Amino acid sequence: MSGRSGNGGQQKMRIRPFMATIDEQYVTQTWELLKRAIQEIQRKNNSGLSFEELYRNAYTMVLHKHGERLYNGLKDVIQDHMASVRIRIIESMNSGSFLETVAESWADHTVAMVMIRDILMYMDRIYVAQNNHVLPVYNLGLDAYRTEILRQNGIGDRIRDALLELIKLDRKSNQINWHGIKNACDMLISLGIDSRTVYEDEFERPLLKETSDYYRDVCKNWLSGDNDACFYLAQVEIAMHDEASRASRYLDKMTEAKILQVMDDVMVAEHIQTIVYMQNGGVKFMLEHKKIEDLTRIFRIFKRIGDSVTVPGGGLKALLKAVSEYLNETGSNIVKNEDLLKNPVNFVNELLQLKDYFSSLLTTAFADDRDFKNRFQHDFETFLNSNRQSPEFVALYMDDMLRSGLKCVSDAEMDNKLDNVMILFRYLQEKDVFEKYFKQYLAKRLLLDKSCSDDVEKALLAKLKTECGCQFTQKLENMFRDKELWLTLATSFRDWREAQPTKMSIDISLRVLTAGVWPTVQCNPVVLPQELSVAYEMFTQYYTEKHTGRKLTINTLLGNADVKATFYPPPKASMSNEENGPGPSSSGESMKERKPEHKILQVNTHQMIILLQFNHHNRISCQQLMDELKIPERELKRNLQSLALGKASQRILVRKNKGKDAIDMSDEFAVNDNFQSKLTRVKVQMVTGKVESEPEIRETRQKVEDDRKLEVEAAIVRIMKARKKLNHNNLVAEVTQQLRHRFMPSPIIIKQRIETLIEREYLARDEHDHRAYQYIA
């Protein structure tokens, strides 16, 4: 039908067909038909049913407003059916087929409810959707099974007990039908209708409690007797793996995670201190015996243990504490070891081995964990710097390495060795102390030609420069520049002296050092032998002619010389009355003449000057040597001790006074005519060790402290010049930040240097705030 509106538009109207009403008898007949069909479906006799006809009948009832009757009727039919199913389940409760009966009834019920839902789909879509207080057809069936079966006559408790018993058998490696457990778990989850409550209440919580009790008993056995932490943790990991495999087969995924958490709590968290500190089997035992596999396992297990009252900070914190304690104990034993303190190379080697071990552990066992890495670095820094000689020892190790230790290694191995020792260098807090010693040893290597390779030296300098900046290596690089000039200087001097009328009787090489660059100790001028004096005067003349305005000051402390010596031994039967010296024979046996022995003695400059005196004296006292040569007393005694009291194979001189270790000024010395050596070239080593004595350490420390005062003052001036005004705390913080790569200045020293700068009028206190300072231009 169509019509026109007043404005000329068209309107379309749809007329619904007339819906005839149905009487009560028809409704009753329709319901009875549906009821019988539902019951047949529940009995699994649905082959003769017409689902299309049944759907139309249900549709008609809902369409004519009889949905409530249909819904309530369905509810009654389901409850009646559940009652009959319950009887069958109760009868099987004491038989071995209980779980199978439950599973079968559940499967039949869910299949039937799917079919019933399809028949009553229109009721779900219309009646159920319009009434919020009723459940959809399928969920109605689930609710009925839960209330009429699961929670009746102890059926739910019996299901739980049966499941727990099967799981207990499975844990004891008995064969079970795990499919039955999985089906029961799936059923309990489905009965929750979009919630895990039923599953959790009926099964999961009891399972977790039973798991906790079971493994608590198991742990007691594993921790008893002679079992150690390595055995215990291996058993824990096996149990965790088995339980995870078991859970993945027939338990819910969320339950698997909860079970593993319970096991972590019961098996690890509750015993964590016992595991870590177990006597002859804990973390210390693993570290001492390099049990890498066990350390990897304990890290893997402890990583799962979170922060709790039982384990504050978590499992890794407890593990890290124990590992750190071992590292500190081992490192402290190294830096305090009396034998190692006498041998700096072994001292550093032990530390490097410890560092390599823990670096390897960090990668292989501890998964490069950042907290472990930071703690290891902190611990190394702590115990390394607890020994104030560490900077000296690291410098000595580098010195030994750069002399001859790297000649037989490849470039890659050399670079690896340098990188390793640079790691220890980074841990040093007093890098300025290291620098002072390193300069001394570098100077000796360069001056005495003891360096294995200039390339290796420069490679190390490059690493130091990268680590500490160009200011740290500036003077070191200048020392190498001086060395490069020596060759040119030596060649031109040789050409110059060839043209001179005065000829030198000795071959001499003089090296010019830039003042302020080389860490040499100034020595008072000594009296040089005539040959040396002439050579020095010629070189001075040559150098001052070539470099106008420069002044040369001779320093004999770091020189060396080859001295030709001839020893005239007495007859073989003669006996000595002195320390390794000659004397008249005390026996009547025949004398056998011995040939003179010609040697080349490799000595330092002062030793050479001392030895040349014996060309003019048969014997001479220490006092006389000092008077004639002007060598300082301490230096003179050191060299005499090396020449007369050193190794037997190096005793060029003999002392006339026997028995004393220390040399007195009255002691007299003579040439040791009995001196013998298989070597033609004999190198005389200084008796004093490489490590500084206590007075030398104090002297070096004092020099370092004096240098630090200047560095602190320079840093204060730099900062204040840039900031103009700054309060005390901020100034201290900035000075510390600037200098920490060389040393850690104490607030007291900084305050003292501030006061000095105020007195010298570089700074002034602020008039309004006496805790603040102003820079005075």
UniProtKB/Swiss-Prot annotation:
Family: Belongs to the cullin family.
Annotated compartments: Cytoplasm; Nucleus
Subunit annotation: Probable component of multiple cullin-RING-based BCB (BTB-CUL3-BTB) E3 ubiquitin-protein ligase complexes formed by cul-3, rbx-1 and a variable BTB domain-containing protein acting as both, adapter to cullin and substrate recognition component. Interacts with bath-15, bath-40, bath-41, bath-42, C17F4.8, tag-303, D2045.8, F57C2.1, ZC239.15 and B0281.5. Interacts with mel-26 (via BTB domain). Interacts with dcn-1.
Gene Ontology annotations of biological process type: programmed cell death involved in cell development; protein catabolic process; protein polyubiquitination; protein ubiquitination; striated muscle myosin thick filament assembly; ubiquitin-dependent protein catabolic process
Principal place of residence: cytoplasm
Crosslinked positions (Glycyl lysine isopeptide (Lys-Gly) (interchain with G-Cter in NEDD8)): 721
Function: Probable core component of multiple cullin-RING-based BCB (BTB-CUL3-BTB) E3 ubiquitin-protein ligase complexes which mediate the ubiquitination and subsequent proteasomal degradation of target proteins. Probably acts as a scaffold protein which may contribute to catalysis through positioning of the substrate and the ubiquitin-conjugating enzyme. Required to target mei-3/katanin for degradation at the meiosis to mitosis transition via its neddylation and deneddylation. Functions in ubiquitin-mediated degradation of CKIs to target cki-1 for degradation.
Composition skew (Low complexity), residue ranges: 576-589
Keyword annotations of the record: Cytoplasm, Isopeptide bond, Nucleus, Ubl conjugation, Ubl conjugation pathway
InterPro entries xrefs: Cullin, Cullin_CS, Cullin_homology, Cullin_homology_sf, Cullin_N, Cullin_neddylation_domain, Cullin_repeat-like_dom_sf, WH-like_DNA-bd_sf
Domain Cullin neddylation: residue ranges: 707-769
Changes after translation: Neddylated. Deneddylated via its interaction with the COP9 signalosome (CSN) complex.
Domain of life according to the entry: Eukaryota
Knockout-associated phenotype: RNAi-mediated knockdown at L1 larval stage results in the disorganization of myosin thick filaments in adult body wall muscles characterized by the formation of abnormal myosin heavy chain myo-3 aggregates and V-shaped crossing of A-bands. RNAi-mediated knockdown suppresses the age-dependent paralysis and growth arrest induced by exogenous dipeptide repeat protein PR50.
SUPFAM superfamilies assigned to the protein according to its UniProt record, in alphabetical order: Cullin homology domain, Cullin repeat-like, Winged helix' DNA-binding domain
GO cellular component, one term: cytoplasm
Keyword Nucleus: yes
Annotated protein name in UniProt: Cullin-3
Gene Ontology MF, one: POZ domain binding
Pathway assignment: Protein modification; protein ubiquitination
Coiled-coil parts of chain: none
PROSITE patterns referenced in this protein's UniProt entry, alphabetically: CULLIN_1 (PS01256), CULLIN_2 (PS50069)
Region annotation Disordered: where it falls in the sequence: 568-596
